[in-house]
A protein has these predicted regions:
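Subset of outer-membrane beta-barrel
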Residues: 1-265
Length: 265
């Protein structure tokens, strides 16, 4: 995992609605505390969709256990807070005294907790995680009895494998399944082709939502850059022409000069 990885995502960058486009920004910082055992990190993610802004601040810890000479197991936990705010100035109401937000609690802090497990080797991985384990009530008014919503756990399952085609070229298929009740289960199917673990090209499919094209390169043992473009296939295609994503990874204190990601994952 890149250390000091910046990630910026505009989920609907092509929507012709100016500054109201959904927007996300994330920052992660990871540090290995000792040889092959402990890892700690910091994660900051901010998302904006219309008048609602959500910011997550989480500290993370993972323990890596060597199962065999080729297989490792990591178990991790993240804990922190989630800040949700509503900018009522961006809302036009038919009734200015709408009880749903009048005299409301427009800024809220909620606890956040997540756990995950990941088995990995040089050529494959499989993992599962849960985010938002702590269900929290959300409301933007002075009385929680008027309108109230609740956060629900997000379940993720992922797996991938590296299939060498030659000494220089490898295919890397992977899948990500997302389960969030009560919405339908969705999944991503991805396929990358890597050349000497230096650069890669690929594509992805997200169920009932989009197709994507991606490319990336390890510029050095400390820096890698990735780019992807999503072609929307859902009903949003009438107002969205696609989404651009750029990822920059920086690996600090890389004493062994390994490329990151080392195995193309």
């Amino acid at each position: 995992t890149p250390i000091g990885q910046n990630f910026i995502q505009g989920d609907a960058a092509a929507m012709p609605s100016g500054d109201s486009n959904p927007y996300g920004r994330g920052y992660t910082q990871n540090y290995t505390a000792s040889e092959s055992h402990h890892g700690v990190g910091l994660m900051i993610v901010s998302d904006k969709a219309g008048p609602i802004t959500q910011t997550n601040l989480n500290a993370t810890y993972a323990y890596h256990l060597t199962l065999t000479s080729k297989l490792n197991l990591a178990v991790g936990v993240s804990a922190g807070v989630n800040h949700i705010s509503l900018n009522t100035a961006e809302i036009t109401l038919e009734n200015p005294l709408d009880p749903a937000i009048a005299n409301g609690n427009n800024s809220q802090w909620k606890p956040d907790l997540g756990v995950g497990i990941w088995a990995y080797s040089a050529n494959y991985y499989v993992g599962a995680s849960v985010q938002q384990l702590l269900k929290q009530n959300l409301y933007f008014n002075s009385s929680s009895n008027i309108t109230q919503s609740q956060t629900v756990p997000h379940y993720f399952f992922t797996a991938g494998i590296k299939l060498p085609m030659s000494d220089d070229v490898a295919l890397l298929p992977s899948v990500l399944v997302k389960v969030i009740q009560p919405v339908p289960t969705t999944f991503d199917l991805n396929l990358k082709m890597a050349f000497r673990d230096i650069f890669w090209l690929g594509g992805s499919y997200r169920k009932d939502d989009s197709f994507g094209a991606l490319a990336g390169i390890n510029i050095s043992s400390g820096i890698n850059v990735g780019y992807s473009y999503d072609f929307t296939t859902s009903a949003l295609r009438t107002v969205s022409n696609g989404t651009h994503e750029i990822v920059i990874g920086i690996l600090l204190n890389n004493r062994y000069k390994v490329r990151c990601p080392q195995h193309g994952f």
